[in-house]
Amino acid sequence: MKLGVLGSTGSVGSQTLQVYENFRDEIELVGILANRASEKLLQQAKKYKPKYVVSYQEPAKEWLESLPEGVKYLKGDEGLKAIIEESERLMNAISGIYGIKPAYEVIKAGKTLLASNKESILCLGEIIRKNRERVIPVDSEHNALFQLLSSVKREEVKHVYLTASGGPFKDKSLEELKTASVEEALRHPRWNMGAKITIDSATLMNKGFEMLEAHFLFDFPIENIKVVIHPQSFVHGILELIDNSFLMHTSQTDMKIPIMHALFYPKRKEYPFKKVSLLELSPITFEKVDTTKFKAIDLAKWAGFMGGVYIPVLVGADEEAVNLFLNKKIGFLDIVDLIEQALSEVNIKDPQSVEEILEAVEWGRQKVREIYERKYAGKG
């Protein structure tokens, strides 16, 4: 199987390469791509020796001279095109909104998209829905649902449940959240992830996103997709069937498990990393989501019901609001407040092309920045 890894230096991209290392005899690594020509990308090129290494930032002369023999450097879109053309499966592990266009190019080329980038699933929703047979979700929750849904008839499923750990603020009061720091928000209790998705996990916006993703990936009505707090993060997806039975997918909190499933589907491979026993996957408890404290889920659901331009605006607004919080410009609760206000001011038409989708995302970013300058800048 010929594999391309887009966003190779991030968390999921790096773990994909760890999986590849254990299956070199079955996988040909066509190329790795990252935004920056960083030391990490160079070390990956040396260790894994792909055919192509690609960055959007111009590398230094010394960096290029350090590439191992047989590894070809390509810049930007030229490199992306080469990797897509020569790969069969492409892991889209690019972080944030920058993963949207590459996902579209993979689908347009008729290749299999291993979808880890949330924003691309959301913004390309209808395109994803029409090409579902060539999209394998990598996110642990959607990968779990992908597996569960293959074992039942669609008409037998009453509800789909996504599980949320609750993040670092599950037991904090609304009053305490007013003064929550960036450092506290980045301490996820279960998963080791990048900064953006960790903050989305703290606000529970990631679960709002995941509801909409499940809607597009599996063609389920939004109202039939539920979120439940599961602090242990052992259960990744649940189906409630019409006979009142529940099917659950359970595994340790290790992204290499869904990565392996997506790489080798429909086959399964022996897991080559540290395993846990069933007894270690306990206890398992579930709790109701406090939507008065975590407004992001209902806000995302509303954007999903509105559809059209509202979803890419939501994505762009979230990107900018999280960035403002990470840079300590706003408070934790301001993240969702800014997004909500941006959505309330939408006055642009529904996008008809990928270019217009990207413009709507950028509109959401700029609108949040504008509201911030209007209401928050200069405070304190």
UniProtKB/Swiss-Prot annotation:
The keyword Metal-binding applies. GO terms for molecular function: 1-deoxy-D-xylulose-5-phosphate reductoisomerase activity; manganese ion binding; NADPH binding. Its cofactor is Mg(2+); Mn(2+). Disulfide bonds: none annotated. Pathway: Isoprenoid biosynthesis; isopentenyl diphosphate biosynthesis via DXP pathway; isopentenyl diphosphate from 1-deoxy-D-xylulose 5-phosphate: step 1/6. NADPH binds at residues 9-12, 36, 117, 119, 194. 1-deoxy-D-xylulose 5-phosphate binds at residues 118, 140-141, 165, 188, 201, 206-207, 210. It catalyses: 2-C-methyl-D-erythritol 4-phosphate + NADP(+) = 1-deoxy-D-xylulose 5-phosphate + NADPH + H(+). InterPro entries: DXP_reductoisomerase (IPR003821), DXP_reductoisomerase_C (IPR013644), DXP_reductoisomerase_N (IPR013512), DXPR_C (IPR026877), DXPR_C_sf (IPR036169), NAD(P)-bd_dom_sf (IPR036291). Its EC number is 1.1.1.267. Mn(2+) binds at residues 139, 141, 210. Coiled coil: none annotated. Keywords: Isoprene biosynthesis, Manganese, Metal-binding, NADP, Oxidoreductase. One of its GO terms (biological process) is isopentenyl diphosphate biosynthetic process, methylerythritol 4-phosphate pathway involved in terpenoid biosynthetic process. Catalyzes the NADPH-dependent rearrangement and reduction of 1-deoxy-D-xylulose-5-phosphate (DXP) to 2-C-methyl-D-erythritol 4-phosphate (MEP). Belongs to the DXR family. This is 1-deoxy-D-xylulose 5-phosphate reductoisomerase. It comes from Aquifex aeolicus (strain VF5).
